[in-house]
Amino acid sequence: MATGLTAADRCAVPAAAAACRAGAAGPGPRLRADPSMTTTDPAMVEVPAADFRHAIGHFATGVTVVTSIGTDGEPVGTTANAVSSLSLDPPLILVCFDRASATLEAVSAHGAFAVNVLGARQQQLSANFARRGLAAAWDGVRHRRGPTGSPRLDGVLASLECTVEHRIAGGDHDIIVGRVREVETSGTDTAPLLFWRGTYASLGQA
């Protein structure tokens, strides 16, 4: 039933609520944006990063811990909220990762990862993976290895185990497209953990 950051991994949010984008990548082909699809109009001024962060913060998201295996065989993981379903046929998911993340190198080498969806009472788990070193984040965390070897965390709402299909460059982040190989849900009505306007939130609040 129920199973399934380093400083470089987390976004600029309060330390007590450092659920954010993560760091990972994979062995699939690395794609870049089509230059013909970008604007060169000098009148188009870019929005300041702080303004963009403030505006996009009004879009509530779920919170996950993305896990994989390092080159030393040890588990790695990072908190991520830039996660979305991409396709049902085939089942694809995308995750946005900080390009400076240590988890990026692990997923790139391993070629697989798991997305663990957190419940409302798992704020501390989210914070641990958002701001601690990779090894310290795993202290006391119960988990088991899935078919790809990626860790599935005990007690989460759902876990999706994926193999890497593509890695797409996107500014200071990379977009990882994963093919979902196995899913597992808790079978409970536990509310999800949300991230909204720079802090954790509940369904009623958001």
Feature-to-residue mapping (PLM):
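Basic, polyanion-binding surface patches
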Residues: 2-206
